[in-house]
Amino acid sequence: MSDLKKAAQQAISLMDLTTLNDDDTDQKVIELCHKAKTPAGDTAAICIYPRFIPIARKTLNEIGGDDIKIATVTNFPHGNDDIAIAVLETRAAVAYGADEVDVVFPYRALMEGNETVGFELVKACKEACGEDTILKVIIESGVLADPALIRKASELSIDAGADFIKTSTGKVAVNATLEAAEIMMTVISEKNPKVGFKPAGGVKDAAAAAEFLGVAARLLGDDWATPATFRFGASSLLTNLLHTLELADAPQGAQGY
């Protein structure tokens, strides 16, 4: 198997297959669940809005997808600085049955010089998750832009108890970049290599996935990237990876997240 095919195979096993669109429906989420069981193996998770968790759980149970995790989003997508609302949303997501919660860090507050609210919001949301629900923190690196701010948001999130740090919501102009990945995984290597990393949005094909996995291997070791420590947040990426593995036709037309 070529290096590119190996990267494609690995990336599928690390994928949070995502639909976070305003026009999402039960039927679209059911279809997403079926897509997550790919000819090359299951994706690590699906990522959906909280209201679709019950239908996703039912569908995954029916199709033998019990091992596919259900991730959802809170404080999404704007990263507001109201801790109480973020906590209520996170508690509700856990009550709905989310295995993982991707919460948006109050990145605008950090850009205005407020480091405290981000730390406290992540800490409170981690407490709301309890012991069994994974918390991923979206720092919106494409808006932070400044390497010092990307580093600071990563440090604050890890210090507050994040299980993963994630680049992006996929709802802004600049999403996952190798530059942000380098900074964020450097912080992970310095602080706690058990914390995971999730590039989201903009990873379009096996070659791009391989580049992100290469940064992970260089900074954290060849065997570091597993579903417990690395995820790709993506939608269109899956079809491209299956095409690389010669298990699907080339994608047609416009592609999303």
UniProtKB/Swiss-Prot annotation:
Pathway: Carbohydrate degradation; 2-deoxy-D-ribose 1-phosphate degradation; D-glyceraldehyde 3-phosphate and acetaldehyde from 2-deoxy-alpha-D-ribose 1-phosphate: step 2/2
InterPro entries to which the protein is assigned, alphabetical: Aldolase_TIM, DeoC, DeoC/FbaB/LacD_aldolase, DeoC_typeII
Catalytic residues (positions): 102 (proton donor/acceptor), 166 (schiff-base intermediate with acetaldehyde), 198 (proton donor/acceptor)
Phylogenetic placement of the source organism: Bacteria, Pseudomonadati, Pseudomonadota, Gammaproteobacteria, Alteromonadales
GO biological process: 2-deoxyribose 1-phosphate catabolic process; carbohydrate catabolic process; deoxyribonucleotide catabolic process
Pfam families assigned to the protein according to its UniProt record, in alphabetical order: DeoC (PF01791)
Matches recorded under SMART domains: DeoC
Gene Ontology CC terms, in alphabetical order: cytoplasm
Tagged with keyword Ribonucleoprotein: no
Recorded catalytic activity of this chain's protein: 2-deoxy-D-ribose 5-phosphate = D-glyceraldehyde 3-phosphate + acetaldehyde
Record bears the keyword Transport: no
GO molecular function: deoxyribose-phosphate aldolase activity
CDD domains registered for this protein in UniProt: DeoC
Family of the protein in this entry: Belongs to the DeoC/FbaB aldolase family. DeoC type 2 subfamily.
Record-listed E.C. numbers: 4.1.2.4
Protein name (Swiss-Prot/TrEMBL): Deoxyribose-phosphate aldolase
Organism whose genome encodes this protein: Shewanella halifaxensis (strain HAW-EB4)
Subcellular location: Cytoplasm
Tree of life domain: Bacteria
Role, per record: Catalyzes a reversible aldol reaction between acetaldehyde and D-glyceraldehyde 3-phosphate to generate 2-deoxy-D-ribose 5-phosphate.
Keywords annotated in UniProt: Cytoplasm, Lyase, Schiff base
